[in-house]
Amino acid sequence: MFNWVKTAMLMAAITALFIVIGGMIGGSRGMTIALLFALGMNFFSYWFSDKMVLRMYNAQEVDENTAPQFYRMVRELATRANLPMPRVYLINEDAPNAFATGRNPEHAAVAATTGILRVLSEREMRGVMAHELAHVKHRDILISTITATMAGAISAIANFAMFFGGRDENGRPANPIAGIAVALLAPIAGALIQMAISRAREFEADRGGAQISGDPQSLATALDKIHRYAAGIPFQAAEQHPATAQMMIMNPLHGGGLQNLFSTHPATEERIARLMEMARTGRFD
């Protein structure tokens, strides 16, 4: 129930941001258009955003015949977590990473890159997929997928405002400063919304994943490996769709500046330290 409240609050916040942007670009008419656009995006995000994200990454669905070891691993972990079997996808990318998406546990999907399967041991891979299934169990996946879709739309509108400006109620060109302000501030606002919901979720998914797998140390060593390997391997699809970065187990973006300042993931060192403490004490609270 609480996650439905968070989802509703997220949709309301992003709708309000759309309306503000619309008003800055086109006055009251722009606000009306932005409201209608936001309502349409909310509907689309709920029903179709997971399919869009998987398509962005050219993810290929696999089964017990095409990826038997990986598929059986996910099935065993889903059983341990008392979850329905999610759809399982592979992404042909060297960069090691993984994510979960969908609107609820009954309509969930997990995806991993071919790179992460090469880099991690079987135990470490179990830790990673348990982390992703924890996102499913906690019903984080709808929030993260909607946020990725809407943040991408906000960036597109900001770019439109920067290059084409807008019109006021009388059809005259809007203040160009407003367009520049929208282009600069809208992506920051979108990033702040992502930050507000992403960092705490990752700690909770680490804890939940450690409970599902029963092996917090393997998730800790997996995070360390992913962090080290990913630093030297660009993730092209993620760079092209930066709004989806917060869905990943590890931030896949390599840019500096705002991308580091507004990182949607907590520090890897802190995540590892918390997991190693769980391994030492045997406590997951």
Curated annotation (Swiss-Prot):
EC top class named in words: hydrolase
Annotated compartments: Cell inner membrane
Membrane topology of this protein: Multi-pass membrane protein
GO biological process assignments: proteolysis
InterPro entries: HtpX_protease (IPR050083), Pept_M48_protease_HtpX (IPR022919), Peptidase_M48 (IPR001915)
EC number: 3.4.24.-
Superkingdom of this protein's organism: Bacteria
Active site, per annotation: E132
Cofactor(s) annotated in UniProt: Zn(2+)
GO CC terms of this entry: plasma membrane
Keywords: Cell inner membrane, Cell membrane, Hydrolase, Membrane, Metal-binding, Metalloprotease, Protease, Transmembrane, Transmembrane helix, Zinc
Classification via NCBIfam families: PRK01345.1, PRK03001.1
Similarity comment text for this entry: Belongs to the peptidase M48B family.
PANTHER family: PROTEASE HTPX
Identification of the protein by name: Protease HtpX homolog
Encoding gene, per UniProt annotation: htpX
